[in-house]
Amino acid sequence: MQLYRQAITEFPRYRGKIYINIDDCGLGGGVTDRLEEVKQEEKLTRMVIVPVNAAGKVPEETLGDGKQKACDIYDNMTTYLWGTVKDALMMEEVSLENDNELVAQFTCRKYRLTSRGKMLLESKEEMKKRGIDSPDRADAVALSCYQKKTFNIGSLVD
């Protein structure tokens, strides 16, 4: 519930609609529910809560090149989310802090191509077998880039 409190505290700093992407699986479901309650109680109409099912299906959206669909490139939602970060960095839509831990998390996770030619990130269980901790910070960045095309990130901060 720390995330819910932080979202409510930080909310007034921003203008326009505020998109809060939450991994809605497991513990995140409670955060999503509580934020929805507070949004209704406090009449926070600018807050848009986006539940993301990291275990769900990859969207059928057309990618930036207009030729391929995300579901034809990425095997699962987590791989797709990480792909949105890669795309945003390549297009210079976002930049990351010089954070050694974050860089390590983004660069230590292996990937492979499936028999259907789709990209698949190494699972957290496979990472653990290699002695690597869960890439929680990288996952948070990936989650924050989800649906990046629905709004201009620069319009949110004063």
Regions found by a protein language model. Give the residues of each.
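Mg2+-dependent endonuclease catalytic cores in nucleic-acid-processing enzymes, primarily RNase H-like
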Residues: M1-G117
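Acidic two-metal-ion nuclease catalytic site recognized across multiple nuclease folds
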Residues: L102-V103, T107-D158
